[in-house]
């Protein structure tokens, strides 16, 4: 076993002495040493139950004959860090999570890893670590929050963000906002729509690194604890059979994940995270492949923010296995990929049934193409991402005057100050991976537009990114970013921008000769500490905003 490096032989007597200081007995040193990466936090609603998940995982490991050892990782709540400087640290935290899991696993010669994430950057960060470390690994997440009930209406966190705009527009009272604030997030768990955390937790099933139903069992269900025990038992089996992430996280598995992302209408952030995870596994996911898959895969689920259903509805309708089974039967997924169950993807789901055809619409899809698209044009030569599943029909084609801002803070003031008009195209730049730095999410601006009733008449484009809760004609990840000399840095107030989501184009309607004579506005955003380190090392959003320095 890998742990023999730290436990076996005469020269390892000092090492064994330290293990015995931890309370180990000799018999435990002959068993698989399983690390549990626990991102428990009292700052993140989606992570406040992970102590219970980890206890169940430990029970499962011990039942199967392994020895569990728990260690901590950091995490950021994107909702709490939204719309202030804190959001600059969200995406950078993904790198630190991946690095920290790698460091602990390698430094202590672990035999296997149980990864216990739940929220936005923690799931991909841990999956990146699994690909990089490549010892037997399994993911067991904390589970989704239940949706709220506010005066008879089903609500979620996005309802509260949009309500801020509604209050500013005089469409909602402060009393109504307070009622919503108190009821929209009723339990622990990852926020209840098909937002980023739930998108990635669902895709971890499809990638094959999590057990079936990992993405949809609500955080407060006892079923979640039972799944955690099974994950603990399964990791010991994976170690014994030497089944590693490299056996599971293949190119075919990633293509399956992209396809399911399209079928589910997942978060735009998933198209930042999947390439980053693939990078650690030496698999290339580029925007051309993503668009090719998008053209073939029907959009079969429409959860919040695109629709009215939530993750608990998807779970009750049959969960990810039911969706996967339906898509495989249409010949659109590779069912032969290996998974942590030791079985193929199809073997995992072949008996899963759709229990609610209003939630999972395999035979009556919302559209014949996927819920996410990559746009290209002279404004985004390397691509930009839109969640077309959450775009109103009247905004699928839009042409309007540019309203240019160099930070999220500037645009938020303009929106809430009533300075954005129907027909405008809001441009937020210098918020990319390097320019921000940190590539902040723009949920507050998009939610404010929606709450003010402008989501069906105003488009928003940015070299930053969006929350999975964002809806409307919100186009992010514009690449190259302004800080790297991208054309978005040349846009001037009043320029005409043309967007055609169906044709996958985004163009600045300014003559090429005129653009050549423009110089980008110089925007300095000095930072220190980790953000400065991040700015120097991070790559473009179109390649997953990874650190190329992690490769030889």
Curated annotation (Swiss-Prot):
The keyword Iron applies. GO terms for molecular function: 2 iron, 2 sulfur cluster binding; dihydroxy-acid dehydratase activity; magnesium ion binding. PROSITE patterns: ILVD_EDD_1 (PS00886), ILVD_EDD_2 (PS00887). Its cofactor is [2Fe-2S] cluster; Mg(2+). Mg(2+) binds at residues 78, 120-121, 441. SUPFAM superfamilies: IlvD/EDD N-terminal domain-like (SSF143975), LeuD/IlvD-like (SSF52016). Keywords: 2Fe-2S, Amino-acid biosynthesis, Branched-chain amino acid biosynthesis, Iron, Iron-sulfur, Lyase, Magnesium, Metal-binding. It comes from the Bacteria. Belongs to the IlvD/Edd family. Homodimer. This is Dihydroxy-acid dehydratase. It comes from Clostridium acetobutylicum (strain ATCC 824 / DSM 792 / JCM 1419 / IAM 19013 / LMG 5710 / NBRC 13948 / NRRL B-527 / VKM B-1787 / 2291 / W). The gene is ilvD.
């Amino acid at each position: 076993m890998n742990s023999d490096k730290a436990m076996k032989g005469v020269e390892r007597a000092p090492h064994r002495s330290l293990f015995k200081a931890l309370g180990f007995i000799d018999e435990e040193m002959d068993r698989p040493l399983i690390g549990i990466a626990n991102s428990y936090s009292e700052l993140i609603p989606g992570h406040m139950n992970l102590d219970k998940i980890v206890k169940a995982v430990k029970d499962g490991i011990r039942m199967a004959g392994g020895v569990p050892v728990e260690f901590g990782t950091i995490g950021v709540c994107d909702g709490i860090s939204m719309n202030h400087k804190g959001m600059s640290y969200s995406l950078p935290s993904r790198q630190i999570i991946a690095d920290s899991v790698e460091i602990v696993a390698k430094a202590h010669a672990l035999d296997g890893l149980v990864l216990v994430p739940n929220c936005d950057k923690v799931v991909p960060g841990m999956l990146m670590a699994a690909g990089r470390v490549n010892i037997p690994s399994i993911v067991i997440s904390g589970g989704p929050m239940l949706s709220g009930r506010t005066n008879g209406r089903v609500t979620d966190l996005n309802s509260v963000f949009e309500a801020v705009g509604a209050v500013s527009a005089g469409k909602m009272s402060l009393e109504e906002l307070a009622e919503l604030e108190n009821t929209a997030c009723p339990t622990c768990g990852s926020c209840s729509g098909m937002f980023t955390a739930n998108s990635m937790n669902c895709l971890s099933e499809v990638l094959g690194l999590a057990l079936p139903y990992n993405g949809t069992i609500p955080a407060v269900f006892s079923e979640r604890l039972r799944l955690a025990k099974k994950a603990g038992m399964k990791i010991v089996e994976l170690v014994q059979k030497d089944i590693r992430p490299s056996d599971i996280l293949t190119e075919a598995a990633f293509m399956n994940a992209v396809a399911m992302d399209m079928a589910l209408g997942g978060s735009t952030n998933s198209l930042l995270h999947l390439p980053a995870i693939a990078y650690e596994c030496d698999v290339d996911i580029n925007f051309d492949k993503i668009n090719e898959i998008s053209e073939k895969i029907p959009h079969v689920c429409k959860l919040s923010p695109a629709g009215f259903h939530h993750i608990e509805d998807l779970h009750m309708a049959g969960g990810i296995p039911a969706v996967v089974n339906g898509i495989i039967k249409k010949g659109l997924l590779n069912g032969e990929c290996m998974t942590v169950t030791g079985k193929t993807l199809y073997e995992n789901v072949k008996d899963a049934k759709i229990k609610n055809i209003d939630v999972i619409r395999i035979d009556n899809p919302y559209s014949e193409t996927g819920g996410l698209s990559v746009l290209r044009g002279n404004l985004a030569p390397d691509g930009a991402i839109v969640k077309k599943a959450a775009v109103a029909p009247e905004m699928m084609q839009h042409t309007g005057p540019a309203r240019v801002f160099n930070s999220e803070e500037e645009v938020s003031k303009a929106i809430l100050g009533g300075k954005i008009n129907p027909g405008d195209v809001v441009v937020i730049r210098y918020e990319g991976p390097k320019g921000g730095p940190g590539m902040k999410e723009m949920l507050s601006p998009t939610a404010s537009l929606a709450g003010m009733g402008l989501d069906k008449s105003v488009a928003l484009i940015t070299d930053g990114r969006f929350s999975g809760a964002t809806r409307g004609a919100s186009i992010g990840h514009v690449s190259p970013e302004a800080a790297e000399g991208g054309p978005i840095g040349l846009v001037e107030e009043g320029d005409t921008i043309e967007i055609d989501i169906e044709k996958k184009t985004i163009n600045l309607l300014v003559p090429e000769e005129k653009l050549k004579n423009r110089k980008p506005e110089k925007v300095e955003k000095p930072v220190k500490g980790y953000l400065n380190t991040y700015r120097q090392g991070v790559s473009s959003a179109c390649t997953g905003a990874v650190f190329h320095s992690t490769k030889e």
